[in-house]
Swiss-Prot record:
Organism listed in the record: Californiconus californicus (California cone)
Protein name: Mu-conotoxin-like Cal 12.2b
Subcellular location field: Secreted
Stretches assigned to coiled coil: none
Top-rank lineage group of the source organism: Eukaryota
Task performed by this protein: Mu-conotoxins block voltage-gated sodium channels. This toxin reversibly blocks voltage-gated sodium channel in cephalopods, with no alteration in the voltage dependence of sodium conductance or on the kinetics of inactivation.
Record's keyword annotation contains Plastid: no
Family: Belongs to the conotoxin O1 superfamily.
Keywords: Bromination, Disulfide bond, Hydroxylation, Ion channel impairing toxin, Neurotoxin, Secreted, Signal, Toxin
Record-listed 4-hydroxyproline modification sites: 77
InterPro entries, per the entry: Conotoxin (IPR004214)
Gene Ontology molecular functions: ion channel inhibitor activity; toxin activity
C-alpha cells in the first residue's frame, strides 16, 4: 500500500518538477529539465512533425498534443513507459 501511494505521488509530481526551479516569465519560457532531455535522448519521447505521440512525452516545443502547444499539465497523453 505504501509503495502504491509513493508511486502515485511521483506520477503526479514529476511533470511539475520544473515549476520549482523554472520561472514562467516571457524571458524565461518553460524548457525541458535534464531528466526530460534524457528521456528524449533515449527515444522514449518523440513528436515528429509536431504530431502527438501517445507515449507520455513531456512537451518541450510547441506544437505537442494540443494546437496551441503543450496541454495544461505540460504532458502528452499516455505514460512514460508506453512506447507505442
Amino acid at each position: 500500500m505504501k509503495l502504491t501511494c509513493v508511486l502515485v505521488v511521483l506520477l503526479l509530481v514529476l511533470p511539475f518538477g520544473d515549476l520549482i526551479t523554472t520561472s514562467n516569465t516571457e524571458d524565461n519560457k518553460r524548457g525541458a529539465t535534464p531528466w526530460q532531455n534524457s528521456l528524449k535522448a533515449r527515444g522514449v519521447c518523440s513528436t515528429p512533425e509536431g504530431s502527438c505521440v501517445h507515449n507520455g512525452c513531456i512537451c518541450q516545443n510547441a506544437p505537442c498534443c494540443h494546437p496551441s502547444g503543450c496541454n495544461w499539465v505540460n504532458v502528452c497523453p499516455g505514460f512514460l513507459w508506453d512506447k507505442n
